């Protein structure tokens, strides 16, 4: 390998395959970058040329989104990627009534 060490995956560097989303209560969710880009807000934070520190670290802190909501958001990212342009029947995405309002506010903020 000519002294060059190539690393694929992980959360570090501009070509990282994963990003780290951190909830208001400190839980870390490592998700595929492609899935996180479902969110217009995260996409803007991770793609602008040096506008946001998140672009360099591939970490996004959400001071207003608790882990029980952010975990559901991450599930939705996977659901959205899986069923966008799918020819199969799309199952309903389950949402517990107890978190519906918080999830709606998070979805509005995240633009997803």
From Swiss-Prot:
Keyword Transmembrane helix among UniProt keywords: no
Keyword set includes Transcription: yes
Gene3D superfamilies reported in the protein's UniProt record: Potassium Channel Kv1.1, Chain A
GO molecular function, one term: transcription corepressor binding
Chief site of localization: nucleus
Keywords, ordered alphabetically: Host-virus interaction, Nucleus, Transcription, Transcription regulation, Ubl conjugation, Ubl conjugation pathway
Gene Ontology biological-process entries: protein ubiquitination; regulation of transcription by RNA polymerase II; target-directed miRNA degradation; transcription initiation at RNA polymerase II promoter; ubiquitin-dependent protein catabolic process
Tissues where this protein is expressed: Overexpressed in prostate cancer cell line PC-3 and breast cancer cell line SK-BR-3.
Primary role: SIII, also known as elongin, is a general transcription elongation factor that increases the RNA polymerase II transcription elongation past template-encoded arresting sites. Subunit A is transcriptionally active and its transcription activity is strongly enhanced by binding to the dimeric complex of the SIII regulatory subunits B and C (elongin BC complex).
Protein name as it appears in the record: Elongin-C
Classification lineage: Eukaryota, Metazoa, Chordata, Craniata, Vertebrata
């Amino acid at each position: 390998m000519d002294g060059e060490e190539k690393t694929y995956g992980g959360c570090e560097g501009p070509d990282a395959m994963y990003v780290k989303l951190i909830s208001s209560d400190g839980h870390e969710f490592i998700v595929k970058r492609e899935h996180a880009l479902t969110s217009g807000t995260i996409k803007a934070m991770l793609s602008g040329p040096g506008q946001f520190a998140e672009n360099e670290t591939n970490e996004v802190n959400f001071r207003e989104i608790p882990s029980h909501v952010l975990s559901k958001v991450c599930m939705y990212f996977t659901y959205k990627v899986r069923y966008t342009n799918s020819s199969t029947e799309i199952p309903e995405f389950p949402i517990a009534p107890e978190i519906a309002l918080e999830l709606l506010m998070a979805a509005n903020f995240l633009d997803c």
